[in-house]
UniProtKB/Swiss-Prot annotation:
It comes from Dechloromonas aromatica (strain RCB). This is Potassium-transporting ATPase potassium-binding subunit. It is a multi-pass membrane protein. Part of the high-affinity ATP-driven potassium transport (or Kdp) system, which catalyzes the hydrolysis of ATP coupled with the electrogenic transport of potassium into the cytoplasm. This subunit binds the periplasmic potassium ions and delivers the ions to the membrane domain of KdpB through an intramembrane tunnel. Its main location: membrane. HAMAP family: KdpA. The chain crosses the membrane at residues 7-27, 60-80, 132-152, 175-195, 279-299, 310-330, 409-429, 449-469, 513-533, 556-576. Keywords: Cell inner membrane, Cell membrane, Ion transport, Membrane, Potassium, Potassium transport, Transmembrane, Transmembrane helix, Transport. GO terms for molecular function: P-type potassium transmembrane transporter activity; potassium ion binding. The gene is kdpA. One of its GO terms (cellular component) is plasma membrane. The system is composed of three essential subunits: KdpA, KdpB and KdpC. NCBIfam families: kdpA. It is found in: Cell inner membrane.
Amino acid sequence: MSNHAWILLGIFLVVLLLTVKPLGTYIANVMEGRFRLAGKIESPIYRLCGIRPDEEMGWLKYACAILLFNVLGVLAVYALQRLQAELPLNPQVFPAVSPDSAFNTAISFATNTNWQGYVGEATMSYLTQMLALAVQNFFSAATGIVVVIALIRGFARHTAKTFGNAWVDLTRITLHVLLPISIIYAVFLTGQGVIQNFNAYKDVTTLEVTSFDNPKLDDAGQPLKDDKGAVVTEPAQTQTQTLAMGPVASQEAIKMLGTNGGGFMNANSAHPYENPTPLSNFIQMLSIFLIPAALCFTFGRIVGDTRQGWAVLAAMTLMFVALAYTAMHFEQQANPLLTQLGVDPASGNMEGKETRFGIGDSGLFATITTLASCGAVNAMHDSFTPLGGLVPLIDMQLGEVVFGGVGTGLYGMLVFAIMAVFIAGLMIGRTPEYLGKKIEAFEMKMVSIAILVTPLLVLVGTAIAVMLADGKAGIANPGAHGFSEILYAFTSAANNNGSAFAGLSANTPFYNVMLGIAMWFGRFGVIVPVLAIAGSLAAKKRIAVGAGTLPTHGPLFVTLLIGTVLLVGLLNYVPALALGPVIEHLVLWAAH
């Protein structure tokens, strides 16, 4: 790993950790109703919507409210896509989005996945981008945060039947946290060169003729392949280029802050209109981890022991550093097949990367975005080396708990913390407890569901795709890498990440439906058990710390938590990883 990469990683961690306490304290004050201006701002909204802020909910009612909120979001996004040809702010006169793609996109943005099988600047009108996709970026982020706040209250309260009001929590986190930070962030991005306008697209003449290979398409619009499975292409030339316009900065801000990741442009944060400078790139990386890291302090603040939050944050940080080092290390190594063709190995694996970012910024961005269930990219993960590309896969397959998405990462890590203290209790023959609450059969059943639902969706979905002709038809690269593309797609969808090995042609009815199902159950198949755990914990009595109680704020617990995440979270995927990136790595270096 280069000196630049080490310095970049060090500066990133220092700046991130400096923000944890102030932002975490602010979020705790907002969500616990201690923000002074909240009442004046919120009261008109509550009256307009008929919400009684003093009426709290049990876990089942809270879960139903969250599900209803998100179902309505799916329906709204689907309708806007299907009607966009008849709606204003469509200067390119884009037609309605196809039913299967609209279904996939609606679920994708409602679940904070932001998987995009379509080309954003060639599919979505400005109204759809703003009113459907950007709005859901706020709402899906708010959903994740309020769920983890509910779980934290479950630990903090005792002998209680309720832990908050879902509508109040959603309002507070959106109005007082997500919205103000996004406004400031969008202004900063505009200053860096991110575009923000409603102009029609611009056709310009390039300085020289551009030659490229254009894939031949069949009657269904899918690439034709030869008998070896390779895409058939034909040479083409052009001297014109269409420059996409649009309100990018306002969407870019919440896309990163809310760990959403869906780009206005198809190239996402590799596009200069979304991420033009190294400074904007650094701030985008920082903003992805900003709220997930701060929520760890919020957790400690609300339960009354900030050491608990720092312990969870320490476990996350240690795993993050190891994974970031691995990604940057393997991307710094040149592809041996390209080296044989005369490419200078000193530059590392620059395929699919922007020269303004290079190896360090691209490798670190890839690690951050896949750990945090963001999915935004500033480089093409499909072009990473086999082991460099293995890191984003592992990041997601850990369950998106190393920082993770806003809210989702922390509640996922707390689920693993419950599992860790349960394992420790079994080893010493004592009833496990965490933060003064006994961990009993009901909690462990819900923990098991929350941990196992995602691997089930990933592995079953991948198996179905490689067995059926419709699934194999989307593979652009046969062999181990083609399998990795499918595995990555279902891993990304079920873990609500949204990034992709872009070689897979996923905008087909088969993948739109299959990935849509994986996204929905990968999100709410975890949220409902987590809320059930919160309700059960809130109803329990708090027990005093005894001589046999495992301290959950020291190095021993941090080590146990990391081990639990690695063993329980990752082992499910080892056979699948062996069939994909591991085989590809061995084949690549065997050829060398």
